[in-house]
Amino acid sequence: MEKLGFHKVSNSPSSPSQPKITHNRPIPHPQSPPLPQRPLSEPLKKQLLVDNSPGNDVVIANCVAVNAQDFQNIPDRAPVILDGVFVYSIAKDDRVRPGTIGLAGNMRTWGKWSLGQPVNVENYNIFHNGQQQQYLGAIDLSIDFRAKARANSNPINHDELVALFLKNYENQILQPTQVIYMEYTGIYFQIRVNNVQIIDVNTKDQLPSFKDSDDINTKGILIKSTDVGFYPYEGSIINLTKPKTLKQRMFGGSTPHRTSRRKQIINPDFKLEDLGIGGLDAEFQDIFRRAFNSRILPPELAEKLDYKHCKGLLLYGPPGTGKTLIARKLSKMLNGKEPKIVNGPEMLSKYVGASEENIRNLFKDAEAEYKLKGEDSDLHVIIFDELDSVFKQRGSGKSDGTGVGDNVVNQLLSKMDGVDQLNNILVIGMTNRLDLIDTALLRPGRFEIQIEISLPDEKGRKDIFLIHTKKLTENGILSSDVNFDELSTLTKNFTGAEIEGLCNSAKSYAISRHTKKGALAQIDPESIAKMKITRDDFLLALNDIRPAFGTDEEDLSQQAQHGIIQFNQTIRNIFEKGQSIIDVVRSSETEHLRSILLYGPPGVGKTSIATTLALNSDFPFIKMLSAETLVGMGELRKIQEIDNVFRDVHKSPLNVLVIDKIENIINYNPIGPRFSNDILQVLMVYLTKKPPKGRRLLIIGTTSQYQVFKHMNLIDSFNDAIAVPPIKHIEEVGKVLDKLGFMNKSEREEILSQLSRYDINIGIKSLIDVLMVSKYSRDTVDEVVNNIVEKMSG
């Protein structure tokens, strides 16, 4: 048997990651434990030289060995304090030379003493000044094999360890960070005191209170009623059985609080502002409340609440909103195992069964630790990016026919919520398409928490600007004229990634101002030292970065190149009614979806009115769906594109969708007649589908086939149907000519005079087309009139 005092012992003060195991031992009244002997002796103060402990019997007794000649007036097993900090009981032993003190390796490591080093020794009275707060109500201990070669995972009876510990060290004074060697069944174990709970019986109502401490200066006497809890060192394979019953330490009618010894799930040094993510305060509150609150509870309380830990967290939303960034930051915040980060397609393999094996391998470490340590195991985080690429709806027929996609979904389901459930995992998934994921994965027990990471609002955009310009501000490079309130207003529907790109573009403009004239790749060193990034740099950058979910004003404005000519009261009424509907969508507490159908013959300006209303709404997201965007697509592909468009217009707080020439979108042909019923049904469903909570949508449709749509019941899907009339009066033609400044006044009057002989019926778009062609052809008045008449008759 090795002699423990003669070997260097590595002190492992790292805190275990596992919760404590409490001992089921009743606690009597605090005044009942017997007091240890208080020897009445002369004050002792000696300086002795450190030597090895004389034998293992002294080591496992947790005593320091001294020669009787040096302690003639001090009884055996009396407590002494070394260097004013470390308290031990003495064991008089003739094997120790006078003037020396025998310290085992674990003692020398704890006190940082070397052999031959002098140490100050004084007798110690824990009850000085009449204090009665020196009994241990509870003690938490880490345990591991002393010799790694003897380590094994055979079950070790926890209750027997507790009984042996109390028998060996009763009435000894113990303190946090102390390391003790104890022998059990012929094997030596290393035990570390992590936390003690001191009983205070000096309260006014004579009921005890309990004070937890992990401070080395906190000392207490181990008594028979002390609650002893063992748990493994971090990384140890020791296998402790659980106590037969959980201890209900009732003391005077109250239950003392015991701090759980499980490693804190949240890194104690973490601060929320360290995440570096702006505009997601509400989302983070939801994540912490639903995913992590249960894991920071003491295990005993969680068991009483029968709280099931969250195993899956799904982040979904448009690209660039920070889903992947959030997952990375959360994994750094968590104080568990190193997270496993995988992309969905990486799980797939061309070999039979390999895809399913890849899924199993992700959970292998968590399974092994959970089998060994149960609820005491660390949290294992698995991060899936592009979840929709692998875990599609089963039976959808979108796989290669091998059924691999279905099997991968089944494998993930069994690992997250199967027969052998794991309680030490958290799977974080990310996707742009929540609708593609198998619905079984979204039920409780799987990805039960689904957080939408949407486009940031104005406050969120300002936060993101502040994050990406923090170093510029700290280093004095950001000009004082930069107004983030202004920039956050100008960047409607920008994602976090797009705002970052905007900041980088502004920096590039600032750098370009400090390049040498005539040289693109040479920096002026004198000028660059004074560089400032100004407001103008950000405004220029706005021309470079366009939001994916923004308004394409150039394309929309081209639909009304000559502006809107309100040639009669009906047109003015259309704009007034349209504006009132816009105000309803913007401000109403109940009407979050409104739809308008503008109908009339071809060429009356329906598209121009629709796009102008959309642009005048000043909504942050305006989208146009027309037959032009669907050219070359088959019917199924068109349906998918329409589905994508409607999903996009649900992502911003305020949205406008212009559906132009609906008859062309549904492939309507009057010969037959023919149309796509599938596309029609999709449109009818989406026209009445309410947007998600917190989102508002205005739909403006146009058609030249009102009667046809009435028979198809499509008109009923719109809230309002507004007729757009053609020009029918000669005065209206005159207003158009005047607005366009066509020819001179006398020529305009001549045109009107000649047209007065005809019945006027022409769309304003058709009229403007004729006038523009005539203008650049330098037609005469008679030719202009003939062109207009031909257009009306054609």
UniProtKB/Swiss-Prot annotation:
**Chain coiled-coil ranges:** none
**Spans of biased composition, class Polar residues?**
9-21
Q: Where is this region: Disordered?
A: 1-40
Q: Which InterPro entries does the entry mention?
A: AAA+_ATPase (IPR003593), AAA_lid_3 (IPR041569), Asp_de-COase-like_dom_sf (IPR009010), ATPase_AAA_core (IPR003959), ATPase_AAA_CS (IPR003960), Cdc48_dom2 (IPR004201), CDC48_domain_2-like_sf (IPR029067), CDC4_N-term_subdom (IPR003338)
Chief subcellular location equals: cytoplasm
Alphabetical keyword list: ATP-binding, Cytoplasm, ER-Golgi transport, Nucleotide-binding, Protein transport, Repeat, Transport
Asked whether the keyword Transport is assigned, the reply is: yes
Question: One GO molecular function term?
Answer: ATP hydrolysis activity
Q: Which Gene3D superfamilies match?
A: 1.10.8.60, 2.40.40.20, 3.10.330.10, P-loop containing nucleotide triphosphate hydrolases
Q: Where is the composition biased (Pro residues)?
A: 27-37
List, alphabetically, the GO terms of the cellular component aspect.
Answer: Golgi stack
One GO BP annotation here?
A: Golgi to plasma membrane protein transport
> Which is an annotated Pfam family here?
CDC48_2
Q: Where in the cell is it found?
A: Cytoplasm
Positions binding ATP in this chain are 317-324, 600-607
According to its UniProt entry, the function of this protein is described as:
Required for vesicle-mediated transport. Catalyzes the fusion of transport vesicles within the Golgi cisternae. Is also required for transport from the endoplasmic reticulum to the Golgi stack. Seems to function as a fusion protein required for the delivery of cargo proteins to all compartments of the Golgi stack independent of vesicle origin.
Family in the record = Belongs to the AAA ATPase family.
* Protein name as annotated: Vesicular-fusion protein SEC18
Instruction: Name the gene behind this protein.
Output: SEC18
